[in-house]
Amino acid sequence: MVGILPLFVVLLIIVSFAMVVAVPVILATPGEWEKSQGIVWSGAGLWSALVILTGVFNAVPA
């Protein structure tokens, strides 16, 4: 059975990869920042939440 910690780690890796690819493309495309600003901030919030949750679940003894 897969625990919650590996799930958070996999999600963190996926979101990190998506942000590494998407943010430079959005910033480099003229006019795209105005349209995609909410998506970038939502992704940053999701990434931050995953970092915190991963740390919390890693610190809690099993």
UniProtKB/Swiss-Prot annotation:
Pfam families: Ycf9
Transmembrane intervals: 8-28, 41-61
Membrane topology, as annotated: Multi-pass membrane protein
Top-level taxonomic group: Eukaryota
Keyword Cytoplasm tagged: no
Name listed for the protein in its UniProt record: Photosystem II reaction center protein Z
Keywords, sorted A to Z: Chloroplast, Membrane, Photosynthesis, Photosystem II, Plastid, Reaction center, Thylakoid, Transmembrane, Transmembrane helix
GO biological process: photosynthesis; photosystem II stabilization
GO cellular component: chloroplast thylakoid membrane; photosystem II reaction center
Matches recorded under NCBIfam families: PS_II_psbZ
Quaternary structure and partners: PSII is composed of 1 copy each of membrane proteins PsbA, PsbB, PsbC, PsbD, PsbE, PsbF, PsbH, PsbI, PsbJ, PsbK, PsbL, PsbM, PsbT, PsbX, PsbY, PsbZ, Psb30/Ycf12, at least 3 peripheral proteins of the oxygen-evolving complex and a large number of cofactors. It forms dimeric complexes.
InterPro entries per the UniProt record, alphabetical: PSII_PsbZ, PSII_PsbZ_sf
Family: Belongs to the PsbZ family.
Subcellular location(s) of the protein: Plastid, Chloroplast thylakoid membrane
Purpose: May control the interaction of photosystem II (PSII) cores with the light-harvesting antenna, regulates electron flow through the 2 photosystem reaction centers. PSII is a light-driven water plastoquinone oxidoreductase, using light energy to abstract electrons from H(2)O, generating a proton gradient subsequently used for ATP formation.
